[in-house]
Structure formats: C-alpha cells, structure tokens
Amino acid sequence: MNSKPSWLRVKMPGGEVFEEVRDLVKRQRLNTVCEEAACPNIGECWNKRHATIMVMGDVCTRACAFCNVKTGVPRALDLGEPERVGEAISKLGLKHVVITSVDRDDLPDGGASHFAKCIREIRKRDPNVTIEILTPDFQGKPGAVDVIASARPDVYNHNLETVPRLYARVRPRAKYFNSLQLLQQVKDKTQGVFTKSGLMLGLGEQKEEVYQVMDDLRCAGVDFLVLGQYLQPTKDNIDVDRYVTPEEFEQYKRMAYAKGFSMVASSPLARSSYHAEDDFLRLRALRTARMRVAT
C-alpha cells in the first residue's frame, strides 16, 4: 500500500533509558519481540523500562506470512535462559512482565516447560511480580497447558491473529479451532488466570467475520481482547489490505464490550503487550469490584 496514514506515524526510538534497556537486554543475551517483530511501540515502551522478552531463541519453526521473526531450524534450548530472564526482570525493576516465544514445534512439549521455568525464576526473585505469557499453540501437544498452568501465570495470552477464512494465507501451519481450544483449556485448568487474545486488522477481513471471532472468544471465556492494525514488517511479508481508521477501531471496541469482554484494547497501534501492566491492573480491579458486588 501507499505510505502510512498520520495516525500510524511514531517517533524514532531513542533516549537514555531506551539505550539502557537495550544494553541490559544485550548483556543478558536475551531476545525481545519488540526488536524481532519490529514493533512500532518500542521507543515508548523501552523508555518506560517495559520490554517483552522472547525466549527459546530467535528462530521460529513456522513461517507465518505476517511475522518478521526468522524461520528455520532452531538451536537447542539454552538451559541458562530462564535464570537470565529472572535476573533481567529484577534489574529492570518490573512489576509486570510479558514473556513470549518463537514456535518450537521441534520440542516434545513445544517449549511449555521452558515457559514454566522462566515464570518460576522470575517469582523466585520477586514473588509479587505479575507475569503475562504469550504462547504459541504448542500444536495441541498433550500436557503443554497443564505444565504452564502449574506455574501460575497471571495472564495467559494466545493470539488468534486473524479470522478463520484468512488462516491458509496468514497462518498456514496453524488451525483456528486449535487456538480456540487452547484458550478454553486454559480457562478450564487455571482458576483466576485472565485469558487474552488478539487480532490484526487490515488483512482483508470483513466486519462480520471479526464479530464472529469475538463471539467465539467469548464462548471460550476469554477476558481481554486486543485489536490492532497489521503493519507489513518487510516487503517479503503479506501486504496490508487496508488501513483501518481510528473510528472503526472505536466501533469494534464498543461491540466487543457489548459482547461481554471485561477489557478491550482497540486502536491502530494496539499490540498484545502494549500498556500490558496498566491494562492488567484495571482488569484485576474490575474483577475485585465484581466480586464485592457478588458478595
């Protein structure tokens, strides 16, 4: 498409705190989805000392059409990574952290146990840190959700990414209903854990299709919906079909709340981990208020 509209233009990242976070990530030999996915919000987030750690390497076993992460044969798991993640979170002084990963279809459990180890290393240093994880679908491997559930994350995020009709083009190695089933399993197996999912808009989806995905997510008990504009990371990725206007994002937000989501982030630059701490605090306060009313 032609140049981005004004509402998608952001400042070039930089600044003292930004450089401090980048140096710390490099010293700890960690990857971040902020860098690997070319996130437009990296400047704002890193200047607030917010970073989304991407574990299990920087090579993915899949090749989703929208993603900027490298595809290929990944290296063996770095067994020291969970400890380094814990140290980095402690040094950054974070109170809410987001951990994500590449797909690791080569591993027997898809990397679920590695997620669990990262959660435990963070909590070992500060039991009060709240932890949000954004996981792949683990190809539906038996026991993967149970392993992560045992580590008790505060928020479990798995993104559907797009509407079912576009899966063959956008997520050719994933299945829509497998992702829905994972989110349902998380709800069934974890008490008190918030579930979250997101869609990229501007890939050719129709409004009615987005509404149907909202209904499917609510049937799976998902609490939090994120809707953001798809931005083409490189010319090799799938093209942007159109730029969804801020007014349309507001319409989607109103509809999502009407369908029963507890929290909705819907704007052109909304991303899974953007303002994650603030959103989590609001979500937790909302649940507390509802429990008080119920009693």
Swiss-Prot record:
[4Fe-4S] cluster 2 binds at C60, C64, C67. GO terms for cellular component: cytoplasm. It catalyses: [[Fe-S] cluster scaffold protein carrying a second [4Fe-4S](2+) cluster] + N(6)-octanoyl-L-lysyl-[protein] + 2 oxidized [2Fe-2S]-[ferredoxin] + 2 S-adenosyl-L-methionine + 4 H(+) = [[Fe-S] cluster scaffold protein] + N(6)-[(R)-dihydrolipoyl]-L-lysyl-[protein] + 4 Fe(3+) + 2 hydrogen sulfide + 2 5'-deoxyadenosine + 2 L-methionine + 2 reduced [2Fe-2S]-[ferredoxin]. Binds 2 [4Fe-4S] clusters per subunit. One cluster is coordinated with 3 cysteines and an exchangeable S-adenosyl-L-methionine. It is an enzyme of class 2 (transferase). It is found in: Cytoplasm. Belongs to the radical SAM superfamily. Lipoyl synthase family. This is Lipoyl synthase. The gene is lipA.
